[in-house]
Amino acid sequence: MELLLVAIAGCTAMDVDAITVKRSEPARFDVTCSGNSTRSVNGNHITDIQVDFDVEFPDSEGGRAAADVLEIAIRKSHDRLCTVTRTVELPTPVGARLRGQ
């Protein structure tokens, strides 16, 4: 479970940073991802996945420009850029096979 949450956080953090850093380096950029491990008749899975951003930019023209695009960058990452999040949200079959058989 933890590895999937780290992958989501890392993927979306890279997207958001790539968009905002064009305007300013952040003074603080922390991203956390949480979820609930669930066991059901359908097997183990994660529910209620949440990505939280704690970002601060300097009080400068570039910092304000980066802050202005922050919400848009987060939305873009979630809606179409982050491959990990998109794969989790869109049902994607995963096959498993043993090589040589």
Regions found by a protein language model. Name each.
Residues M1-V6, V16-Q101:
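Extended beta-strand/beta-hairpin segments
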